[in-house]
Curated annotation (Swiss-Prot):
GO MF term list: small ribosomal subunit rRNA binding; structural constituent of ribosome
Function of the molecule: Binds together with bS18 to 16S ribosomal RNA.
InterPro entries named in the record: Ribosomal_bS6 (IPR000529), Ribosomal_bS6_sf (IPR035980), Ribosomal_S6_plastid/chlpt (IPR020814), Transl_elong_EF1B/ribsomal_bS6 (IPR014717)
Entry protein name: Small ribosomal subunit protein bS6
GO biological process, one term: translation
CDD domains to which the protein is assigned, alphabetical: bS6
Family: Belongs to the bacterial ribosomal protein bS6 family.
Gene that produces this protein: rpsF
NCBIfam families tied to this protein: S6 (TIGR00166)
Length: 137
């Protein structure tokens, strides 16, 4: 049975030819189905170190595939040392889920802007002497 999936995988930062591995992994995903949307986000920093690495090549694919193709993808990704992490979401069962690689990029920029605003907020500094005089008045 063919279902819709959103697949994200991260490749090792030291990998010389990412296109070859991306083509291999996308080929496995498209067996018995088709790739609807594919986007390479490039080399991005990790929030925390993974296997003593600080960066990785992010790739997002929206695909209609069989469960066998997804299982084969996960098996190959676990074996290949150049694949750092994978995430597979079955989006067919999630209500009101909008699948778009572009949408996920815009959501991240909004999130980063909100975090920046929160980070820059500081309470005004009041010296102890000034605070004591305000309380006495």
């Amino acid at each position: 049975m063919i279902k819709k999936y959103e697949v994200m995988y991260i490749l090792d930062q030291d990998l010389k030819d990412t296109k070859e591995l991306v083509a291999k992994l996308d080929g496995i995903l498209s067996e018995g189905g088709q790739i609807l949307e594919s986007n390479d986000l490039g080399l991005l920093d990790f929030t925390y170190e993974i296997n003593h690495k600080k960066k990785g090549f992010y790739h997002i694919v929206i695909v209609q595939a069989t469960t066998q193709a997804i299982k084969e993808f996960e098996r190959i990704a676990k074996i290949d040392k150049n694949v750092v992490r994978t995430l597979v979401l079955n989006t067919q069962n999630i209500q009101n889920y909008e699948q778009s690689v572009v949408l996920s990029k815009t959501d991240m920029t909004k999130f980063e802007e909100e975090q920046r605003e929160k980070k820059n907020f500081r309470k005004p500094f009041i010296k102890r002497e000034e605070a004591a005089t305000k309380e006495n008045k």
